[in-house]
């Protein structure tokens, strides 16, 4: 039941935040491996990107990739939050004094995140391809011509096999390790600290909301460079064997980006990342916490 509640919580958040994921993906691919000032900026900021995409691609384009996004969130977070929830309920994340251990929480969050992200990697790759697809006048990054999630998965599988479907999976793991460990460690530690200070009642929804807000800020700051590199790894063009033509891996993507675009290139789309990851983290953790509270209250 923990896995089902975790997946549903993440899907609930995804419906609201997917347009921000589209904007974030476009901004991360804009000016890829080009020096600042040498390329046309189709998307000047988050709000301009929203208007531009809606005007040129149509309002429906702001929900591009929603199907794979929902499936990925259900698989990835169902496994990640579900596994973490079981570890927490089993007392494995607590010290002898009964308080949360930040180190154990971070380790559990990282391991749970790796399992979910690796299994869901093909879905995330297709999501990235679909969200990057745009009209030629505002296109950024390599443009795949997928018609939908199932067509894309079938085509990639037929051309490149399982290796092609899981291309970039290992490179995407550092992003998830950093993000998941930061998110769950910060969320649990903040909840524990606020409970000790008795700012809110133990089962108050406000406790979960404030902890989720703090977690969202921490995740965005820690995860941004890895998120940019991951988006580019998944979206790069490939040769006949399905091998990426631009980057050899996550480290190469980070180094090339920093060398060509400067340190700020590694934080492209951070505004969109915050507007997306912040609400997504808050909503998914809040829904997860409330669903678990309702379930365990009703089953007592």
From Swiss-Prot:
It catalyses: a dicarboxylate(in) + sulfate(out) = a dicarboxylate(out) + sulfate(in). Gene3D superfamilies: Mitochondrial carrier domain. It is a multi-pass membrane protein. Its main location: mitochondrion. It is found in: Mitochondrion inner membrane. The chain crosses the membrane at residues 38-58, 59-79, 91-119, 169-190, 205-225, 277-300. Keywords: Membrane, Mitochondrion, Mitochondrion inner membrane, Repeat, Transmembrane, Transmembrane helix, Transport. One of its GO terms (cellular component) is mitochondrial inner membrane. Solcar repeats lie at residues 1-90, 100-193, 203-294. It holds the Pfam family Mito_carr. Putative antiporter that exchanges dicarboxylates and sulfur oxoanions across the inner membrane of mitochondria. Belongs to the mitochondrial carrier (TC 2.A.29) family. This is Solute carrier family 25 member 35. It comes from Homo sapiens.
């Amino acid at each position: 039941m923990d896995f089902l509640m975790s997946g549903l919580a993440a899907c609930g958040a995804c419906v609201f935040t997917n347009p921000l994921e589209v904007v974030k993906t476009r901004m991360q691919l804009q000016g890829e491996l080009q020096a600042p000032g040498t390329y046309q900026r189709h998307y000047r900021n988050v709000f301009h990107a929203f208007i531009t995409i809606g005007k040129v691609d149509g309002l429906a384009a702001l929900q591009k990739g929603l199907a794979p996004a929902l499936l990925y969130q259900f698989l990835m977070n169902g496994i990640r939050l579900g596994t973490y929830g079981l570890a927490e309920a089993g007392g494995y994340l607590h010290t002898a004094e009964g308080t949360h251990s930040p180190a154990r929480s971070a380790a559990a969050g990282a391991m749970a995140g790796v399992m979910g992200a690796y299994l869901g990697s093909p879905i995330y790759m297709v999501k990235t391809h679909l969200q990057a697809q745009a009209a030629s006048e505002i296109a950024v990054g390599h443009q795949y011509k997928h018609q939908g999630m199932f067509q894309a998965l079938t085509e990639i599988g037929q051309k490149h096999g399982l290796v092609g479907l899981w291309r970039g999976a290992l490179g995407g793991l550092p992003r998830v390790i950093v993000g998941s460990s930061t998110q769950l460690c910060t969320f649990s530690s903040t909840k524990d600290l606020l409970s000790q200070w008795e700012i809110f009642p133990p089962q108050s929804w406000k406790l979960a909301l404030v902890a989720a807000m703090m977690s969202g800020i921490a995740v965005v700051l820690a995860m941004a460079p890895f998120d940019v590199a991951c988006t580019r790894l998944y979206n790069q063009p490939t040769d006949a064997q399905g091998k990426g033509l631009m980057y050899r891996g996550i480290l190469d993507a980070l180094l090339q980006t920093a060398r060509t675009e400067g340190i700020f290139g590694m934080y492209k789309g951070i505004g969109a990342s915050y507007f997306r990851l912040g609400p997504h983290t808050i909503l998914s953790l809040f829904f997860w916490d409330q669903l678990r509270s309702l379930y365990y209250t009703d089953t007592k």
